[in-house]
């Protein structure tokens, strides 16, 4: 069975929680020492220039089952630990935090994105592999986080500052530490692949059911694109929950949440203590209405080439426009002034949502 990769959706909040807590209540040494770090940038060359002090995080979801019980693995229908030996990922989000630290943009990148994987050395260091067209998930499988970063930077001309990787267990633990997450579906869901059966309307999901919710993709005919929309809605719900319930401002709740997440999160080795403290102070007042989510603009969801097969092709005009705006830390929403009546109109050509929105209106 194909592994399900849904962990990406909660990681912006995880980053915020880890960062905020590190400099506020738990003690920098304790928190920083608890995070597993890996070197992902050390051997990268010819990288894009950093043209502003905005920050770009690449967040990747690992499909490792480590930490899940046999009953949970069976309930999730994700295959055994043996079947999923090691950690694989082909889902990702890029999180842009503005230079003033008052806005954020979260971009979902489809796992089947058509890409040209740069020339690289094989994982065992024995073979030189030339530039190769493939789906973007191949970059992680062939060369881990460094090759994935190199591929994305070559496609976007956007410098990635930090890397965060999370797991199934990390997602489940975080939702449970929050006491569950409230979601709303406009339509009933009955997905035999994710084992999720849910009536239309408002639901409070625990960690296991939340994992089913963000994995579901076999009930509405929209596949991964529909799943990404639900994932964006879910991360917005997590952000609303964390801020409205006072979790980020409550030392006890934050401590419990941080403990649940730290065991299953790893970051790049350059995300040091000073970075955490500084960013913690800067983003603590970031609100859901200032966080926008979107999928990278697409031109073709069934782009076929003999070498790659069916893939997802980015829009050749809108996608470069989006990356250029993030590179220069420019707004993703255009404000247009009418010359005749001086009225102001907002143009959202990237079809974004804010984390303060939800698909069913008020969840009261």
Regions found by a protein language model. Name each.
Residues 2-364:
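Non-catalytic, solvent-exposed segments at the cell envelope interface
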